Amino acid sequence: WEIAKAFDYSAPVGKFKKISELKCVDDIAFGMKLNGEWVQQGHSRDMIFSFDRIIAHVSRFVTLNEGDIVFTGTPQGVGEVHVGDKLELFLEEKSVYVFQVN
């Protein structure tokens, strides 16, 4: 999986959001539109492990600092993207990141 997921420019990251700005960290709605069509929608409540548990586990093996990112997986709807495709990412029903595949 590493080759399919970890290549140059494969993990764009937008602006950070403070936890205090979220209604409930255990129920964060998120999703993605591909060329204007919803292809992924999910909630943090559906994760197998809570954020706290994931952070506790990972920090047993590596030092985590403020600003570090821990990728946790993705909801169903994974698929290919192609040059020219437009991706729009949502957090709590707000568009937070839009980009086009070059």
Language-model segments: which ranges?
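Catalytic-core "active-site belt" of small-molecule-metabolizing enzymes
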Residues: 1-61, 65-69, 77-102
